[in-house]
């Protein structure tokens, strides 16, 4: 996932 915003609350890649 390279289109992930600054949401470390949902995506923790």
Curated annotation (Swiss-Prot):
Annotated localization: Microsome membrane; Endoplasmic reticulum membrane
Entry keywords, A to Z: Chloride, Chloride channel, Endoplasmic reticulum, Ion channel, Ion transport, Membrane, Microsome, Phosphoprotein, Transmembrane, Transport
GO MF annotation: an example: chloride channel activity
Entry comment on modification after translation: Major plasma membrane substrate for camp-dependent protein kinase (PK-A) and protein kinase C (PK-C) in several different tissues. Phosphorylated in response to insulin and adrenergic stimulation.
Membrane topology: Single-pass type I membrane protein
Hydrolase is among the record's keywords: no
Function: Induces a hyperpolarization-activated chloride current when expressed in Xenopus oocytes. May have a functional role in muscle contraction.
Family affiliation: Belongs to the FXYD family.
Listed name of the protein: Phospholemman-like protein
């Amino acid at each position: 996932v390279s289109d992930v915003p600054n949401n470390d609350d949902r995506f923790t890649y």
